[in-house]
From Swiss-Prot:
Pfam family, one: DUF325
Family matches, as InterPro entries: DUF325
Protein name per UniProt: Uncharacterized 16.2 kDa protein
Taxonomic source organism: Orgyia pseudotsugata multicapsid polyhedrosis virus
């Protein structure tokens, strides 16, 4: 359980974004980018975290717990593919249970990254580029080398 000082710090970082802490992948990615842009190495030392990524993850967790504690991501309106290997910190995530779509399940504990991306065929269409990108995502999801 984070201390009151850390909770205040985390919420102050995202004060202008708090209305956007919702169960939507794009908003969560924006939240992480906002937090990542505001934390410093001095903050890492001040709160005793092992790394910047761990601090960002903790800030993400505080904000989600305060502003959207019971929210779930509606996968009918969200991307349906995610990276099992984080593209930010290269940690491997557990595969989410098919019936658990809570926000916390899609945030990587190591760095707070949202492990959901757009389906490559939705982005590129059924082109060679789209198919190649889909194969790359599937390789990463299967735990292949980066």
């Amino acid at each position: 359980m984070p201390g009151a000082r850390f909770v205040r710090f985390s919420l102050r970082l995202t004060q202008e974004f708090k209305e956007n802490v919702v169960a939507h992948v794009d908003h969560l990615m924006g939240l992480r980018a906002l937090i990542d842009g505001k934390v410093t190495s001095a903050d890492v030392r001040r709160f005793g975290f092992l790394s910047r990524n761990v601090l960002v993850s903790a800030c993400m967790a505080v904000n989600v717990q305060v502003y959207a504690p019971d929210a779930t991501i509606d996968m009918r309106h969200q991307p349906t593919i995610y990276f099992r290997v984080c593209q930010n910190c290269h940690a491997m995530a557990d595969v989410p249970a098919p019936d658990d779509h809570s926000i916390a399940r899609y945030l990587l504990a190591e760095c707070g990254a949202v492990l959901v991306i757009d389906h490559p065929l939705d982005v590129f269409g059924e082109t060679e580029e789209g198919v190649n990108e889909l194969l790359e995502v599937q390789r990463i999801n299967a735990g292949g080398d980066l």
